[in-house]
Curated annotation (Swiss-Prot):
Family: Belongs to the G-protein coupled receptor 1 family. Adrenergic receptor subfamily. ADRA2B sub-subfamily.
Segments passing through the bilayer: 1-25, 37-62, 73-95, 118-140, 157-180, 354-377, 387-389
Chain residue ranges for the region called Disordered: 192-218, 231-310
Disulfide bond positions: C72-C151
The protein's name in its UniProt record: Alpha-2B adrenergic receptor
Keywords: Cell membrane, Disulfide bond, G-protein coupled receptor, Lipoprotein, Membrane, Palmitate, Receptor, Transducer, Transmembrane, Transmembrane helix
Organism per entry: Procavia capensis habessinica
Amino acid sequence: AIAAVITFLILFTIFGNALVILAVLTSRSLRAPQNLFLVSLAAADILVATLIIPFSLANELLGYWYFWRTWCEVYLALDVLFCTSSIVHLCAISLDRYWAVSRALEYNSKRTPRRIKCIILTVWLIAAAISLPPLIYKGDQGPQPRGRPQCMLNQEAWYILSSSIGSFFAPCLIMILVYLRIYLIAKRSNRRGPRAKGAPGEGESKQPHPLTAGPLALANPPTLATSLAVDGEANGHSKLTGEKERETSEDPGTPTLQRSWPVLPSSGQSQKKGVCGASPEEEAEGEEEGSRPLSVPASPASACGPHLQQPQGSQVLATLRGQVLLGRGVGAAGGQWWRRRAQLTREKRFTFVLTVVIGVFVLCWFPFFFSYSLGAICPQHCKVPHGLF
């Protein structure tokens, strides 16, 4: 039964991590530089499932080391190498998450594939520095036990403590502190609300946005000396008044603007005929009626062409140079804010998933490293039974 369960775990580990590598390498949406951590982590887990777990299963089932003595030493070194690499990868991912949240603009500009690969190389070098000493310095191994050969980890106290601290306790402490810090940053960010993150509406309604683009678009809209106020909507039209209006000094040929600024109807309302198809007499009559709000199109092309859809909750201010869209939450700043909000949501979701992974990781690894370290601290009185170990 144990062999069947372990075999299923081996196959599941290989298949699942192979899918992770395949997804990152083939999907464009997953080709972000930080996902290289997942590729390297998945590779380390696949190596554990193929080179470590099968020999460990055979050793437990047979009760002795069936393979060569030299392979036992290499096997133990690879065991420490791959497991330490997997743990330090999780630590590096947590640090990457923290830097991306705390220093978003600065770190995201530096988060290049080259930089991520250098961090991954450093992770593997740390794992190698912890796993290779038993191969280089074997120390006093003592007499070999009689009977069938055994393959056991290094029992020297200095190596047990140093490898346990470097492989588990130090990375685990770093991950716990980092994710606690990320949680506090996310909590403080949620308390501030969207306005602290640059909510639309603070500075967006103060600057009009062009409605159209191209040669007929409004290039330089008139400058409003004072803020305009909306009096109210009557007969399907919104009347906008201001204390003072003046034209820009860049174009001396532009006539002086009248006191009442005509406003086009809101979305869903039909436009009146103003320029396209009007006779000179009709245009003159329209100019004489200065107190009545007029619907002036941006250009003859826009008046004769298909009706442009304007966003809901926005108004179009008609000027002598064209149309100016006074939007509520519409524009580049609003789009950037929503994109930033979606990005933060993804960051929080990813951080939550990684936190679950870290929790499972601690529950799985802590019993082994705790009992392994006790053998170096008090080998006589605190020794854990071999079956439990």
